[in-house]
Design a protein with these regions (language model features):
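Core segments of small alpha/beta cavity-forming domains
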Residues: 1-25, 105-140
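Residue-identity detector for glutamine
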Residues: 11, 27-28, 82, 86, ...
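Surface-exposed, charged secondary-structure patches
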Residues: 21-79, 138-169
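Short, structured motif recognition centered on aromatic/hydrophobic residues
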Residues: 70, 83, 92, 114-117
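Short beta-strand edge/turn micro-motifs at domain boundaries
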Residues: 75-104, 169
Length: 169
């Protein structure tokens, strides 16, 4: 998928045209001549992945998958844009783009919580576990992992960059 997003020529070759584009349940089609290269997540400094449960992390490297979706989740406008890929003859092909409200997402409550958490430091302070389990790499040896706990005031010194308005999945 990364190569698809990064390479304009490959992207056109690996998109099924006319491409089905469904917005709020209404289907349209994008012709190849109207396609604009979409970098997906490749221009971002990081990307996020949401899992329902820890075991779902194993799917990320599962070679037997035939379908996969990449999502842009727009936290501030409550929209999701899904890029649906299907493996055809061993090649990943973009088959559909679908855009709809996050209100239809099974994890809408989490998205609402996360948006408030990322954008409101008072809300963060109220919702950080006390103490917070913290796992990081050892600055003196990047192959070693440190496990400790943080107090709420330490959270603000060690917290990662949080997506404020949009995230990938």
């Amino acid at each position: 998928i990364y190569n698809y997003a990064a390479n304009e020529k490959l992207q056109k070759a690996r998109t099924v045209f006319p491409l089905s584009y469904i917005k709020d349940g209404e289907q349209q089609f994008i012709e190849e001549k109207n396609w604009e290269h979409d970098h997906l997540f490749t221009k971002e400094n990081y990307y996020t992945l949401l899992y329902d449960k820890e075991e779902d992390m194993d799917f990320e490297k599962n070679p037997s998958l035939d379908t996969v979706s990449v999502e842009w989740i727009y936290l501030d406008t409550h929209e999701i844009r899904q890029y649906h890929f299907q493996r055809k003859n061993g090649l990943w092909m973009l088959t559909t783009i679908e855009q709809h409200s996050t209100l239809e997402a099974p994890y809408e409550d989490f998205l609402e919580f996360f948006y408030k958490f990322a954008n409101d430091s008072i809300f963060q302070r109220e919702h950080v576990a006390r103490p917070l389990k913290f796992v990081t790499s050892d600055p003196d040896d990047e192959f070693q992992i440190l496990e400790t706990t943080l107090e709420v005031d330490q959270w603000f010194a060690f917290k990662p960059l949080l997506p404020l308005h949009k995230m990938t999945n």
